[in-house]
């Protein structure tokens, strides 16, 4: 509710131990500046005695505290929204006598007052814009954490909280999206389900493209999601905990992480920039024995700063799940003292075109050692054409225009593995030249009656999606099952950057992965497969997609392309 002053809302209620709690927003002029003067009761947390109705003030210094709720350990928390004296939105811990930094109600009286720091800052438009209703979550691996709604940024966010030197601080993650409206209220129902109230308004208050109203019920399905569960502060870096173990041998490469640090300074101006933003150099990455934690060692952590962690590699869990979100925002009110993270020596030194001991033990084989083309040859030939060379530690098609107008490169042509494979997992890193086209073709049959690998083998497309003509066609883009199934997500990197591709084929069930995302799944040889082939450009090729195994091919489509870290693991056929 609100009175005649713009934005002078009252928010709540939360109930705890015989008292109702609410928050009172300050009055705001059109445009966002605080009204002057303010009523002295504004920007406060109030509590009301359930029995006799007596009202008292608990905390002050808030701006637009849209939501108060019971969070972790049964304490009260408030979501406050960006504005003057508030450089970004935040979640605060309600304590008796706390003052949260807004000076608009009493500019002179609060001039020298020390602000109670937020549990988490919510960097504007990165992980928040209009936060609402903090609540505890007591389900699955998230027990002891908090969630809150978001009106404009949308969805529900999750907050891990820890106590450092008596001060609560923590990390915020993406959690839930895809709801029907911006989220203004969330509440747990008597059966343990989460009820979500949506809202919106024309202009800049509401999630773009969503309804301006809504009520939805979310039910926890007891299924695991692979994601960052927690990020913890250490004296010498940060520790990331995942909900599932990483793949064997993964997580040790410092190039797969990015860490930045900055701080905010409240002023009378609306919002505020990131100040002294710096990228921190990661000295080492250490993986725990259970592969569920990674400690990032780096110098330069400072009190009263934000620490941003980005997983540059889209990790895959040991069970084959793609990670849900790759970013975390930690509010470092205080750097812990005497709490160093565990630094371990990496079990291997990563190098292109090599296998780790763990990979060897798991059955992986190299198909390219970075030194020779052994194991590869042109389709229906015994050697590799001179157009294929070794460059940048990769098999490279140094494509030169064909003067006779042929679409393939001079002395190039498609190359194939010497050996045929049926049930396997295949991985490769590839990059393509500007506006280039290539492909990874599998189940290739080599017989005299076939002139090209694609007369029998399906293709995982390799493409520069930005400017190759094929990018205009759905199912012709990078990662697609060419001309049949488009990617679920667009995950390809720009031309000139390395992509990680994976093909898993087992008993006719095939998955394509691109840069850590499972982008395409299908089953070969069933009625649906036959229907897809009949509707594709391969419909007049009688043997297309019929083979249960075959050679793996790297395509010459007349454009420069590179392939490295080419590995395969043969899989056992499932018992029928």
Question: What kind of region is each of these model predictions?
Answer:
Residues 342-576:
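Carbohydrate-interacting regions of secretory-pathway proteins
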Residues 245-284, 310-317, 326-330:
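Short, surface-exposed alpha-helix to beta-strand junction/turn motifs within ectodomains of secreted
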């Amino acid at each position: 509710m609100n009175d005649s002053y713009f934005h002078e809302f009252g928010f709540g209620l939360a109930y705890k131990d015989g008292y109702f709690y609410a928050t009172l927003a300050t009055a705001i002029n059109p445009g966002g500046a605080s009204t002057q003067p303010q009523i002295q009761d504004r920007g406060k947390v109030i509590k009301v005695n359930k029995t006799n109705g007596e009202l008292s003030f608990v905390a002050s210094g808030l701006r637009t505290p849209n939501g108060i709720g019971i969070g972790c350990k049964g304490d009260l928390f408030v979501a406050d929204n960006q504005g003057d004296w508030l450089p970004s939105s935040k979640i605060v811990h309600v304590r008796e006598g706390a003052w949260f930094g807004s000076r608009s109600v009493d500019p002179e009286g609060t001039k020298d007052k020390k602000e109670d720091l937020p549990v988490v800052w919510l960097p504007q438009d990165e992980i928040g814009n209009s936060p609402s209703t903090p609540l505890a979550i007591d389900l699955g691996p998230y027990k002891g954490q908090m969630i809150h709604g978001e009106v404009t940024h949308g969805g529900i966010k999750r907050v891990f909280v820890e106590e450092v030197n008596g001060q609560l601080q923590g990390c915020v993650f993406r959690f839930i999206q895809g709801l029907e409206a911006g989220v203004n209220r969330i509440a747990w129902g008597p059966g343990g389900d989460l009820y979500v109230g949506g809202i919106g308004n024309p202009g800049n208050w509401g999630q773009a493209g969503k309804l301006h109203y809504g009520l939805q019920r979310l039910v926890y399905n007891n299924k695991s999601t692979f994601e960052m569960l927690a990020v913890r502060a250490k004296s010498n870096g940060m520790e990331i905990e995942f909900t599932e173990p990483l793949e064997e041998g993964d997580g040790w490469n410092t190039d797969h992480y990015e860490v930045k640090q900055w701080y905010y300074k409240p002023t009378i101006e609306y919002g505020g920039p990131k100040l002294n933003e710096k990228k921190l150099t990661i000295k080492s990455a250490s993986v725990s024995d259970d592969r569920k934690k990674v400690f990032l060692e780096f110098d330069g952590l400072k009190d009263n700063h934000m620490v941003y962690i980005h997983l540059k590699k889209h990790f895959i869990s040991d069970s084959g799940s793609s990670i849900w979100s790759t970013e975390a925002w930690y509010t470092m009110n205080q750097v812990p003292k005497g709490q160093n993270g565990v630094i371990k020596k990496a079990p291997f030194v990563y190098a292109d075109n090599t296998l780790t001991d763990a990979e060897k033990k798991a059955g992986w084989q190299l198909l390219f050692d970075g030194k020779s083309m052994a194991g590869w040859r042109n389709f229906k030939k015994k050697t590799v054409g001179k157009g294929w060379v070794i460059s940048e530690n990769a098999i490279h098609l140094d494509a030169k225009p064909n003067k006779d107008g042929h679409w393939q490169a001079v002395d190039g042509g498609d190359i194939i593995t010497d050996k045929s494979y049926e049930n396997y997992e295949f991985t490769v890193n590839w990059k393509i030249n500007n506006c280039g086209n290539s492909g990874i073709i599998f189940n290739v049959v080599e017989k005299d009656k076939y002139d090209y690998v694609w007369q029998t083998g399906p293709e995982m497309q390799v493409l520069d999606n930005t400017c190759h003509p094929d990018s205009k066609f759905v199912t012709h883009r990078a990662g697609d099952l060419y001309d049949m199934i488009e990617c679920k997500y667009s995950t390809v990197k720009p031309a000139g950057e390395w992509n990680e591709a994976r093909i898993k084929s087992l008993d006719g069930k095939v998955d394509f992965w691109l840069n850590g995302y499972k982008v395409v799944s299908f089953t070969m040889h069933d009625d649906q497969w036959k229907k897809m082939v009949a509707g594709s450009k391969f419909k007049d090729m009688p043997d297309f997609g019929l083979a249960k195994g075959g050679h793996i091919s790297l395509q010459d489509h007349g454009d420069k392309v590179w392939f490295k870290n080419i590995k395969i693991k043969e899989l056992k056929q499932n018992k029928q």
